[in-house]
């Protein structure tokens, strides 16, 4: 499966489009796809991130490489849509690879570009990523991770509201944020007074909002702040100036440039001042409360929606030292209220949801089968399945568990960071699939699956296991099947598992 991604970065565009496409490409690569980026070499780009991620990169040269910040996103292309589409088509054709999937993430591109590309590659699956909802699209799938966005908002633009993934549940952030979420939430739940402040204004910060905030912080006193950590991207043109300001600050300031451990840093910090954009959803996933700074006109919708929900929002062009002091004071005073608000905005599972909507694995009826991570809210549903006769028939322990024991068991599984616990969905929740680590083994897991009685015989189990193999193709999976469970024996053999004993099957992943 070949995937071509079209996205850009620059002083004006920032780094967010490339970063979220990289997150998506890494997940697709793990699922077996071959991903190729096509980007323009604008001034202030982060194309090095693509090559560092070991992805092939084809560059469209630009006419104007001056380092001027441009506000209007329609001008970010440095050219017209039809020429860009033809250049894209030409580079794809030169690769001699059929584009099974095309992904485009660019505020300067819309239906005009998509129509040209679709006409040239009509069999390709076209995925459009957008946040603005201000122009028409004609892709096969549209992803808009804007907070409180709904598919219906695209009705007047696209002529329909179908096949749209809308809202922060589809935020394309790196899976490490979901992995560290519980640890971060638990740590911050015990904080009485926040002391460690993170300051991050995006990967470029062409307007030097970071410097402005540092100047303002010098004018106010927050005795609780023990340390300020400033995060800058490699493309930030003001890094030297900001480093000098940090050294002169009355606060203990550390400046970090071009980091690769954002999730770990968010785990360690108590609160933040941060730009709107992809890092907003990263902060929320980690339960890191923040003063959110709107740094671009195209962030107004997100800013308004967050403010209406109770989040703290400032406009980069308008706020002063007094307003920053009030915002930080409010955050410190209402710390846990803001912490809970943040963690409820985004759970960090967007990437796994999006991948399953791009790569379809249907049951016999053609309906896509997906997995979502189980939570405490699923305890009763799982118990209902545990009590069904078909579940007990082939379980190691045929006795129905007591409810209190089930709750304790499931909570321990959810708290175990090494266990993968999923709910199977086929239009609605219909089963459970779990991967438990095998003792004294490295990257070896035992699979367990059970469905509701009404879901048997529909190909759902087969699709769910295929989905599990897709999401976890870097581990060894072991299946233990009772001798009399003939259907499961046939299922695992059909899916390519190797029988290693009368009751055990194994599949090794590369």
Predicted ranges, named:
Residues 182-269:
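Donor-nucleotide binding loops and adjacent catalytic segments primarily
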Residues 336-348:
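A short, well-ordered alpha-helix in the C-terminal region of glycosyltransferases
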Residues 365-379, 385-388, 421-423, 427-510:
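Acyl-donor (CoA/ACP) binding surface of acyl/acetyltransferases
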């Amino acid at each position: 499966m070949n995937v071509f991604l079209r996205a850009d970065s620059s002083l004006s565009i920032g780094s967010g489009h490339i970063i979220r496409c990289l997150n998506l490409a890494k997940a697709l690569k793990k699922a077996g796809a071959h991903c190729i980026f096509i980007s323009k070499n604008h001034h202030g780009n982060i194309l090095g991130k693509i090559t560092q991620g070991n992805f092939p990169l084809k560059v469209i040269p630009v006419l104007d490489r001056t380092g001027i910040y441009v506000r209007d996103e329609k001008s970010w292309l440095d050219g017209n849509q039809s020429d860009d589409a033809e250049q894209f088509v030409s580079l794809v054709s030169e690769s001699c690879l059929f584009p099974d999937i095309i992904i485009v993430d660019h505020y300067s591109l819309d239906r005009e570009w998509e129509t040209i590309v679709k006409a040239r590659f009509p069999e390709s699956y076209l995925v459009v990523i957008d946040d603005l909802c201000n122009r028409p699209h004609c892709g096969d799938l549209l992803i808009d991770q804007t907070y409180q966005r709904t598919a219906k908002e695209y009705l007047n633009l696209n002529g329909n509201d179908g096949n749209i993934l809308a809202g922060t549940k589809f935020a394309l952030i790196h899976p490490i944020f979901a992995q560290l979420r519980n640890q971060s939430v638990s740590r911050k739940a015990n904080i009485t007074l926040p002391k460690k402040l993170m300051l991050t204004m995006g990967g470029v910060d062409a307007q030097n909002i970071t410097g402005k905030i540092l100047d303002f912080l010098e004018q106010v006193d927050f005795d609780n702040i023990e340390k300020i950590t400033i995060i800058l991207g490699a493309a930030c043109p003001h890094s030297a100036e900001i480093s000098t300001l940090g050294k002169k600050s009355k606060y203990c300031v550390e400046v970090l440039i071009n980091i690769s451990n954002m999730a770990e840093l968010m785990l360690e910090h108590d609160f933040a001042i941060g730009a709107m954009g992809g890092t907003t959803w990263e902060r929320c996933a980690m339960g890191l409360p923040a003063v959110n700074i709107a740094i671009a006109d195209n962030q107004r919708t997100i800013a308004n929606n967050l403010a209406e929900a109770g989040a703290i929002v400032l406009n980069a062009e308008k706020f002063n030292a007094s307003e920053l002091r009030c915002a930080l004071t409010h955050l410190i005073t209402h710390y846990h209220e803001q912490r809970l608000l943040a963690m409820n905005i985004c759970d960090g599972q967007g990437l796994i949801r999006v991948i399953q909507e791009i790569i379809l694995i249907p049951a016999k009826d053609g309906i896509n089968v997906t997995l979502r991570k189980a939570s405490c809210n699923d305890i009763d549903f799982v118990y209902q399945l545990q009590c069904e006769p078909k579940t007990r028939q082939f379980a190691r322990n045929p006795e129905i568990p007591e409810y209190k024991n089930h709750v304790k068991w499931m909570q321990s599984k959810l708290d175990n960071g090494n266990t993968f616990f999923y709910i199977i969905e086929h239009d609605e929740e219909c089963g459970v699939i779990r991967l438990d680590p095998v003792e004294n083994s490295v990257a070896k897991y035992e699979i367990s699956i059970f469905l509701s009685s009404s879901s048997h015989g529909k190909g759902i189990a087969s699709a769910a296991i295929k989905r599990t193999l897709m999401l976890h193709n870097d581990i060894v999976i072991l299946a233990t099947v009772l001798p009399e469970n003939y259907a499961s024996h046939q299922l695992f053999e059909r899916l390519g598992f190797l029988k290693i004993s009368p009751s055990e099957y194994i599949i090794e992943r590369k």
